[in-house]
């Protein structure tokens, strides 16, 4: 899918070529992959700036634009009164039509971090399934805001973890950074693996997965992210070089929450007890035996 359409996120991105190449590139992608059994829907965009109904978001650099888009805002009913289609909505229809012309067996979606019904992509009525990037608090009222629509969580969670590091009490939720435009400062540059630390626009793995399991209109989710990755260091900036989002770290070792998903997504027996046992005498320790698929667990 496209990471940008006509509106650029950085000076030398695909927006320079969108007008000339979008139809050829989208066509080539679909013809290449439409016979793959793993393809169950097509996305025509990820956090494209055309979604946004506020012009300020289109004037920012890449990092600032993504962060401010993720911050979200309250739904403005006044924006819904205008029923005319914008250029952005027409582009959405155009791209969806290309997909449908080449593959009628799959649905079309787009990953959006603008969850307002005034979102130009949503207003096009060309998306079979609406994709939300984070914004878990809008999952429950989804059907009130989008009657008759379907939802997939195209990016979820954005929880922060460092394998082997634990911050207690484990039931306290740490929001880091407090503001999208300022890094969190701590000398260790680590994040708790109790699933109790996440960014302001995200949520914990447990809370997000509970919503997906219990809300019938939510079809599923993609976890942001499967692996830590170089770039977008969050919540710390330099000298951190990588994200802390993954359920697997850069060395390929699973973090604790990996076993929550394994207990939910596989039929294998799972019992994962943590944290580690390398503590000094007298230190309080919160022990979790929560990641399992047993009827009960006895320590």
Which residues does each PLM region occupy?
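Extended substrate-binding grooves/exosites of carbohydrate-active enzymes
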Residues: 1-299
């Amino acid at each position: 899918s496209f990471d940008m359409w006509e509106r650029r996120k950085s000076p030398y991105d695909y927006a320079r070529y969108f007008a000339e190449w979008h139809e050829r590139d989208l066509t080539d992608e679909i013809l290449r992959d439409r016979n793959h059994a793993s393809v169950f829907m097509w996305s025509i965009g990820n956090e494209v700036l055309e979604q946004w109904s506020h012009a300020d978001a289109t004037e920012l650099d890449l990092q600032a634009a993504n962060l401010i888009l993720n911050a979200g805002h309250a739904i403005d009913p006044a924006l819904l009164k205008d029923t005319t289609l914008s250029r952005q909505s027409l582009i959405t229809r155009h791209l969806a039509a290309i997909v449908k012309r080449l593959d009628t067996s799959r649905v079309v979606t787009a990953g959006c971090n603008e969850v307002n019904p005034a979102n130009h992509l949503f207003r096009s009525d060309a998306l079979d399934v609406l994709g939300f990037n984070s914004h878990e608090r809008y999952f429950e009222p989804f059907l009130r805001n989008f009657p008759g629509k379907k939802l997939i969580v195209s990016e979820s969670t954005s929880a922060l973890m460092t394998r082997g590091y634990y911050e207690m009490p484990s039931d306290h939720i740490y929001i880091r950074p407090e503001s999208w435009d300022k890094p969190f400062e701590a000398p260790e540059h680590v994040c708790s693996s109790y699933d109790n630390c996440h960014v302001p626009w995200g949520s914990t793995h447990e809370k997000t997965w509970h919503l997906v399991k219990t809300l019938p209109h939510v079809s599923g989710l993609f976890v942001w992210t499967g692996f830590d990755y170089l770039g977008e260091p969050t919540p710390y900036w330099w000298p951190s070089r990588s994200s802390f989002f993954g359920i697997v770290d850069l060395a390929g070792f699973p973090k604790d929450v990996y076993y929550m998903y394994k207990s939910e997504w596989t039929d294998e027996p799972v019992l994962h007890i943590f944290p580690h046992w390398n503590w000094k005498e007298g230190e309080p320790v919160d022990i979790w035996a929560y990641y399992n698929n047993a009827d009960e667990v006895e320590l």
